[in-house]
Swiss-Prot record:
<dbReference type="GO" id="GO:0002098">
    <property type="term" value="P:tRNA wobble uridine modification"/>
</dbReference>
<feature type="binding site">
    <location>
        <position position="236"/>
    </location>
    <ligand>
        <name>K(+)</name>
    </ligand>
</feature>
<feature type="binding site">
    <location>
        <position position="255"/>
    </location>
    <ligand>
        <name>K(+)</name>
    </ligand>
</feature>
<dbReference type="InterPro" id="IPR018948">
    <property type="entry name" value="GTP-bd_TrmE_N"/>
</dbReference>
<keyword id="KW-0479">Metal-binding</keyword>
<dbReference type="InterPro" id="IPR027417">
    <property type="entry name" value="P-loop_NTPase"/>
</dbReference>
<dbReference type="GO" id="GO:0003924">
    <property type="term" value="F:GTPase activity"/>
</dbReference>
<feature type="binding site">
    <location>
        <position position="257"/>
    </location>
    <ligand>
        <name>K(+)</name>
    </ligand>
</feature>
<dbReference type="InterPro" id="IPR025867">
    <property type="entry name" value="MnmE_helical"/>
</dbReference>
<dbReference type="InterPro" id="IPR027266">
    <property type="entry name" value="TrmE/GcvT_dom1"/>
</dbReference>
<dbReference type="InterPro" id="IPR027368">
    <property type="entry name" value="MnmE_dom2"/>
</dbReference>
<protein>
    <recommendedName>
        <fullName>tRNA modification GTPase MnmE</fullName>
        <ecNumber>3.6.-.-</ecNumber>
    </recommendedName>
</protein>
<dbReference type="InterPro" id="IPR004520">
    <property type="entry name" value="GTPase_MnmE"/>
</dbReference>
<dbReference type="InterPro" id="IPR006073">
    <property type="entry name" value="GTP-bd"/>
</dbReference>
<feature type="binding site">
    <location>
        <position position="464"/>
    </location>
    <ligand>
        <name>(6S)-5-formyl-5,6,7,8-tetrahydrofolate</name>
    </ligand>
</feature>
<keyword id="KW-0460">Magnesium</keyword>
<comment type="subunit">
    <text>Homodimer. Heterotetramer of two MnmE and two MnmG subunits.</text>
</comment>
């Protein structure tokens, strides 16, 4: 534990700016009650009943009111951080909040009260076993949620839904490890612990449950991160019109002049709660215009980073030689949807096709101008993302969670291989189970480095 993890800390816990209510939060750390009671007396001029709202004046150093509001005192361990906590709820003007914050710092100087760092209150909650690491991350995810579905999923993670799944997996792995260790420790016994307890069957069940958890986590990661979708193609094929159609607003300038879009135009839209980060880019062509060439270079950079590329074509011409050249440069591994736009000029009905000669490629015929086929394109993007309609019960997950789950999955797969060669590989079987358990524990913080904690909590807002 870092030395600063026990310092008394204070911060404004509400967003910057003006509001009806502002909150200053103090967590007393090692100071405990000996620090809390004198500060309460100095600020409020009276004792506070624990866990009761008291309407009091907030006093300056001379005993004059700075403000009046609600004071709440939570003795340890029954508080957000698990420490003695004081919350002062006053009027939410920035000057009033700064005066109240400075008054706390001045009154608490004797016991080392300092400004909190970003995420430090939630870090204290984690260190004091009020939250595990997945729940602590869910606090930030709930604050940052950009869709209702993401907010609900973050709430489920904060309530411990994700953590309970991980703890159940860890318990099952530990039980299986005990069987393996027993067989290793008593090789001369007639009892075959692995056979008697159906160790292989237990491992198969753990792997199936892990696959289910990983599937839900992928859905949650989609809700949190969304999908980066790049519109690419030659000039004047309707990329900007498609962006406007997907967004339902006139975001990009649309003209019949080739090269109108010279830099990217980005917009995030929601489809079934999934954030789709749509990026309109400069038309891809050979040009002598230096500004346009810079825009085209940026287009290729965006394509390299994309989750999905929408390759737009003019449905009147179909796939031209120039389009073939563009398609050949698309990075391997990035899904591409071929979008044939302007069907309003050809009379071709909006549809989704899977050309037999094109492998996994999908073609969507649509009219961005009229809106025909836009819903089909949205559905195709969700399909590529792997979103399952009605997956409301998922919990929000982060990339580090997915990495740990995949690593645990690989260790369990290796354990299954060793189980088939029991006589030669029992030690390796046990080791793979241990490594899988370690990966799962890292998700909830049972086994986590201080460096990782620093990165996670530094991304929180101050006062949380």
């Amino acid at each position: 534990m870092l030395a600063t993890d026990s310092d008394p800390i204070v911060a404004i816990a509400t967003a910057a700016g003006r509001g009806g209510i502002g909150v200053v939060r103090v967590s007393f750390g090692r100071g405990g009650e000996a620090a809390a009671l004198p500060l309460i007396d100095a600020l409020c001029g009276q004792k506070l009943a624990p866990r009761h709202a008291s309407y009091v004046p907030f006093l300056d150093a001379h005993g004059a009111p700075l403000d009046r509001g609600i004071a709440l005192y939570f003795p340890a361990p029954h508080s957000y951080t698990g420490e003695h906590v004081l919350e002062l709820q006053g009027h939410g003007g920035p000057i009033v909040m700064q005066l109240l914050l400075q008054r706390c710092l001045d009154a608490g100087r004797g016991f080392g009260l300092r400004l909190a760092e970003p995420g430090e209150f939630t870090r204290r909650a984690f260190l004091n076993d009020k939250l595990d690491l997945a729940q602590a991350e869910a606090v930030a995810d709930l604050i940052e949620a950009s869709t209702e579905a993401a907010a609900r999923s973050a709430g489920r993670s904060l309530d411990g839904a994700f953590s309970r799944q991980i703890h159940a997996l860890v318990d099952d792995v530990i039980t299986l490890r005990m069987l393996v260790e027993a067989t290793l420790d008593f090789p001369e016994e007639e009892i075959d612990f692995l056979e008697a307890a159906d160790a292989r069957g237990k491992l198969a069940k753990i792997r199936a449950q892990l696959a289910h958890v990983l599937g839900d986590a992928r859905q949650g990661a989609l809700l949190r991160e969304g999908l980066s979708v790049v519109l690419a193609g030659q000039p004047n094929v309707g990329k900007s019109s498609l962006l406007n159609a997907l967004a339902g607003a006139e975001l990009a300038i649309v003209t019949p002049i080739a090269g109108t879009t010279r830099d990217k135009v980005a917009q995030t839209i929601q489809v079934e709660g999934i954030p789709l980060h749509i990026i309109d880019t400069a038309g891809l062509r050979e040009t002598e215009d230096e500004v346009e060439r810079i825009g085209i270079a940026r287009t290729w950079s965006e394509i390299e980073r994309a989750d999905v590329v929408l390759h737009l074509l003019d449905s009147r011409t179909g796939m031209t030689a120039d389009d073939e050249t563009i398609a050949a440069r698309f990075p391997a591994g990035v899904p591409v949807v071929r979008v044939l736009n302007k069907t309003d000029l050809t009379g071709v009905p909006a549809c989704v096709e899977h050309p037999a000669a094109e492998g996994d490629l999908t073609e969507v015929h649509l009219s961005a101008k009229r809106g025909d086929g836009i819903d089909m394109l949205r559905a195709e993007l969700l399909r590529i993302a792997g979103w399952q309609a009605g997956a409301e019960g998922v919990y929000l997950a982060r990339e580090r969670h997915l990495i740990a789950l995949r690593a645990a999955q690989e260790h369990l797969a290796q354990a299954a291989n060793h189980a088939e060669q029991r006589a030669q590989s029992l030690d390796l079987f046990a080791e793979e189970l241990r490594l899988a358990q370690e990966q799962l524990n890292a998700i909830t913080g049972e086994f986590t480095s201080d460096d990782l904690l620093g990165v996670i909590f530094s991304r929180f807002c101050i006062g949380k």
